[in-house]
Amino acid sequence: GGMNAGKTVYQDENEFGEAAGVEKTLKAAADNYADNETITALAATVADQWAAYQANPTGYFDSVELMELDTMIGGKGINDPALVETLCSNSADAIDWLEENGITLHNVSSFGGASVKRIHRPVDGDGKVVSVGAYMVPLLEEDCQKAGVQMMMNTTATEILTDDNGAAVGIKATGASGETVTVNAKAV
């Protein structure tokens, strides 16, 4: 696995060879989702972007809207469009933030239902792709420890605590030994 992100600088390090993937996605949108306003609007935007790219093919073709279209089609059109837009429009920034925090995901490849190379993966010292979770989690844990974040492993949240107005103010959880743990917080 890896982390999907659309329109990153790392994609531009690749030669674009996924025209068939873009065409297939646009065809799937037209053939299978003509009655879905979100998919139809995204497909129209992507078709315009694709035509502009074909007229002047520089860099690697991808866009936030193409990632949204892939995600909406992958979810059979029932995804929450606002959540999909949030995910896709922030994905490149997430890759950049990880980079700023010492987590390098420069290897870009195809994966899942993406029409273009969009999955960003880590590599080891020999250039071999490694599991993103096994790579990232220890680095993020180290950053959390440096920042003084208390981590609770093998602890299962069982209840969200709320105040009289219904705002979340903490959680109750069960610890590894079966003990009840209460965590109060300003934000949950």
Predicted regions and their residues:
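Conserved N-terminal glycine-rich FAD pyrophosphate-binding loop of Rossmann-like flavoproteins
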Residues: 1-17
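Generic low-polarity alpha-helical segments
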Residues: 3, 10, 140, 144, ...
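A composition-driven signal for long, intrinsically disordered, charge-rich low-complexity tracts
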Residues: 8, 20-21, 114
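Acidic, His- and aromatic-enriched active-site or binding-groove loops in soluble protein domains
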Residues: 8, 174, 184
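Charged, glycine/proline-rich intrinsically disordered loops and linkers
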Residues: 15-69
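Conserved redox-cofactor binding core of oxidoreductases
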Residues: 46, 59-179
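Short hydrophobic core segments
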Residues: 157-158, 182-188
